[in-house]
Each structure stands twice: as structure tokens, then as C-alpha cells.
């Protein structure tokens, strides 16, 4: 150190004033350093004082709330106002508008806490907005009882017994109950019983409508004596006494003895016909024949009476009428 100062004094030419000036500068620098240190001490003391005045916060707070230095937490009143405002906005929007907003933004709206209080959702699972499950409306199934599987062999046997039997409905019903197998359900007998009741009603109606004079006789037309007709009609002897063909002609005033249906058992080709024109020709021929027979009979009766008359007029008749050989020329 001393060697360096000695070299400095011998190698450098400097004045005393310069040395003094340099010392003054050093003093200023020292004063600046002292001032800076004083200022630093003052700032440190003030910071320590402000830190001492403020209450110290620890990690565990008595009220159980922890705050972060980077997050600004609003007060409770401000949070209530924000929630109230969001509720008003949600209520003012209709479900259609909410759905449109969801489609535009691509995010679902806030779920209703009342409807989703059951099971918590998994935050990791993401559900798509557009669901592919489309429910198709279907017709509700009826609650009517389904018919059980029927035994066709037993049913055919019962039907053959029903159609081949000439007895009444009650007898058929009892015979079918006897022939029905014990394992068959009662549902199989219900339709047959209904059919038997209907057939029995038709048979009773037919028995009532049959004429009382002949219990075993079948109904026949009183004009053509046929027993096969699709419908019985009213005639001169009362309702349901003529067949369909004869009843139609009777209603129109054209029923004559010469008319007979072709299927009538009393049909004679020389006397009857089912054509109106042919019937009129037969009637005309019949009337002409009857008139001719009446004329011949009347003329023959008159001649016989005049010949065998014993009165005085008999001679005049013989004179004026040339009956027998004329003998006057011989006299």
C-alpha cells in the first residue's frame, strides 16, 4: 500500500489543490452514502412501524375464511345483488330464447337446482348438446284379455256335432258340453254358445212363422205351390202367403192363373208361362175358345127346343126353315 502511494507521488505530478479537491469529493461521496444509509434506515423503520401497527394475519383465520392475494372477492351484499340480477334475466327469457342461446353459444344454460338435486354429475364426463335418442310416440296397448290357444281338433269335433245334429239349440248345447274336453278353457265355449243362441232364435222364429194348420208342413206359395223363395210376400189371403215372383205380380195387378214361375212344381208348358207376353196370348186363346164353345152350345140348344115344340108355331117353323127333306114338291 505504501509502495503504491510512493510510486504515485514520484510518477505523477499533481498539486496540493487537486489533492484537496479530491478529498472534498470523497467527503461528498461519504456524505451521500451516509445520507443514503440514513434514508434507508428511516424507510426501514417506517415500514417496521407500519407493519407493527397493522394486525398480523396468520394462515389459520378465526372465521374460517382464507383469501388469495391475486383474487378479489366481492362482499356478500354485492354477491346477492348479482345473483338477483341473474335470476331476473333468466326469468325474463322464454324457454325458446334460452334454447336458441344454447344453440348459438354451444353451451348449456345453468341447470335448475330443484330438478337436479338427485345425483351429482361427473365433471369429467362431457355430454353432447344434441342427443340422438328420439322418442317415437306409439299407440298404447289395449288391456283386453287375449284369447287362449284353441284346440282345433276338439273344436272341429264340436262343430261337426253342431251342424249334423237336427235337434234344438238346448240339446246341442248339452251335447257339446258333454263332448268338450275337461282341459279346454271356458273361453272356447263362449263363441259357440253365442252362435247356438242365435241359431236357436232363428229356428224359433221360423217355427212361429210357419202355418198352424200343418205343424210339420213347410210353407208353400198359394198360387204356384213353390216352397223355395228368397222372400215371402203378401197375397190375397194375407201376409207371407205368396212367393217373391207371385207377390210382385200381385202387387202390380198382373197375377193371373196362367202365370207360373219356371221352378214351380205345378208348371205346365201348354197352360202356363213366366213371360207376360206369352201369358197374354194364352189368355186370348183361352177366351176365344170359351166364346166358341158357348156359341155352339147356345145355338144347338135353341134348335133342339124348336124342333120338339108341339105348339102351333111348329108348323111355321118347319115351313120357313128347311129342316129335313122337303116333301112339298111331291104333293
Curated annotation (Swiss-Prot):
GO terms for cellular component: nucleus. A motif (Nuclear localization signal) lies at residues 139-146. It is found in: Nucleus. Residues 34-47 have a biased composition (Low complexity). Residues 116-134 have a biased composition (Polar residues). Overexpression of GATA12 induces the formation of ectopic xylem vessel-like elements. Belongs to the type IV zinc-finger family. Class A subfamily. This is GATA transcription factor 12. It comes from Arabidopsis thaliana (Mouse-ear cress).
Amino acid at each position: 500500500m505504501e509502495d503504491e502511494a510512493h510510486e504515485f507521488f514520484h510518477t505523477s505530478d499533481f498539486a496540493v489543490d487537486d489533492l484537496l479537491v479530491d478529498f472534498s469529493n470523497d467527503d461528498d461521496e461519504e456524505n451521500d452514502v451516509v445520507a443514503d444509509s440514513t434514508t434507508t434506515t428511516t424507510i426501514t423503520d417506517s415500514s417496521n412501524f407500519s407493519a407493527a401497527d397493522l394486525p398480523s394475519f396468520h394462515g389459520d383465520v378465526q372465521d374460517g375464511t382464507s383469501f388469495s392475494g391475486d383474487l378479489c372477492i366481492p362482499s356478500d351484499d354485492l354477491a346477492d345483488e348479482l345473483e338477483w340480477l341473474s335470476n331476473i334475466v333468466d326469468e325474463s327469457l322464454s324457454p325458446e330464447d334460452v334454447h336458441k342461446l344454447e344453440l348459438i353459444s354451444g353451451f348449456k344454460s345453468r341447470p335448475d337446482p330443484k330438478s337436479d338435486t338427485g345425483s351429482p354429475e361427473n365433471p369429467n364426463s362431457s355430454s353432447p348438446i344434441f342427443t340422438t335418442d328420439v322418442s317415437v310416440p306409439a299407440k298404447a296397448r289395449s288391456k283386453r284379455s287375449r284369447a287362449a290357444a284353441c284346440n282345433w281338433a276338439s273344436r272341429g269335433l264340436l262343430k261337426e256335432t253342431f251342424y249334423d245334429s237336427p235337434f234344438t239349440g238346448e240339446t246341442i248345447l248339452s251335447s257339446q258340453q258333454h263332448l268338450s274336453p275337461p282341459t279346454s278353457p271356458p273361453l272356447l265355449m263362449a263363441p259357440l254358445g253365442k252362435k247356438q243362441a242365435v241359431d236357436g232364435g232363428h229356428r224359433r222364429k221360423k217355427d212361429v212363422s210357419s202355418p198352424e194348420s200343418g205343424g210339420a208342413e213347410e210353407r208353400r206359395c198359394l198360387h204356384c205351390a213353390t216352397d223355395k223363395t228368397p222372400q215371402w210376400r203378401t197375397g190375397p189371403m194375407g201376409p207371407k202367403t205368396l212367393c217373391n215372383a207371385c207377390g210382385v205380380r200381385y202387387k202390380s195387378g198382373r197375377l193371373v192363373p196362367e202365370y207360373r214361375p219356371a221352378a214351380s212344381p205345378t208348371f205346365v208348358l201348354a197352360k202356363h208361362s213366366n213371360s207376360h207376353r206369352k201369358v197374354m196370348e194364352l189368355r186370348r186363346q183361352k177366351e176365344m175358345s170359351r166364346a166358341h164353345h158357348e156359341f155352339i152350345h147356345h145355338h144347338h140348344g135353341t134348335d133342339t127346343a124348336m124342333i120338339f115344340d108341339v105348339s102351333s108355331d111348329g108348323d111355321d117353323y118347319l115351313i120357313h126353315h128347311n129342316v129335313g127333306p122337303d116333301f112339298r114338291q111331291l104333293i
